[in-house]
Amino acid sequence: MILGMGTDLCMISRIEKSVERFGDRFLNRVFTEAERAYADRFTGAARMGSYAKRWAAKEACAKALGTGFANGVLLQDIGVCNGPGGAPELLLSGGAEEALKRLTPSGQEAQLLVSMSDDPPFALAQVIIQSVPLAGVQSAPQASVRIEPLANAAKLR
């Protein structure tokens, strides 16, 4: 079951200007240590694109949670890392993790799906939060849909 969905579009230059103006103060406030280490492997436009995608993913996740950056959800509570195959993954802590727990129905576990892309001047991210039954928990039977052939379509007119 889909619990939430969020999308964010970010101007890469907006992140670049914030980095130029505030430097490490901005980066340390917004991004986790792991996010900074990942983005700082790159230089120039690729570095800013990496930061902008992560910014967009944080925004999209906050929207999917239904909280925005309020009710105790902070930018640092949403971390973006890359899994073993390179695909982005979200790691929640603090207020974001608590919001996810409140959103997730009993007997279910949440799965966070994230997709990110950048094509200057933009960076984009989309987050979908879905719930699935916990392992070993019997879920309610799903409604079945029966599709009849169109042979009887004339009867519908």
UniProtKB/Swiss-Prot annotation:
Localisation per UniProt entry: Cytoplasm
Record organism: Gluconobacter oxydans (strain 621H)
Pfam families: ACPS (PF01648)
Function comment: Transfers the 4'-phosphopantetheine moiety from coenzyme A to a Ser of acyl-carrier-protein.
Protein name: Holo-[acyl-carrier-protein] synthase
Sorted UniProt keywords: Cytoplasm, Fatty acid biosynthesis, Fatty acid metabolism, Lipid biosynthesis, Lipid metabolism, Magnesium, Metal-binding, Transferase
GO cellular component: cytoplasm
Record-level Gene Ontology MF annotations: holo-[acyl-carrier-protein] synthase activity; magnesium ion binding
Gene from which the chain derives: acpS
E.C. designation(s): 2.7.8.7
Reaction catalyzed: apo-[ACP] + CoA = holo-[ACP] + adenosine 3',5'-bisphosphate + H(+)
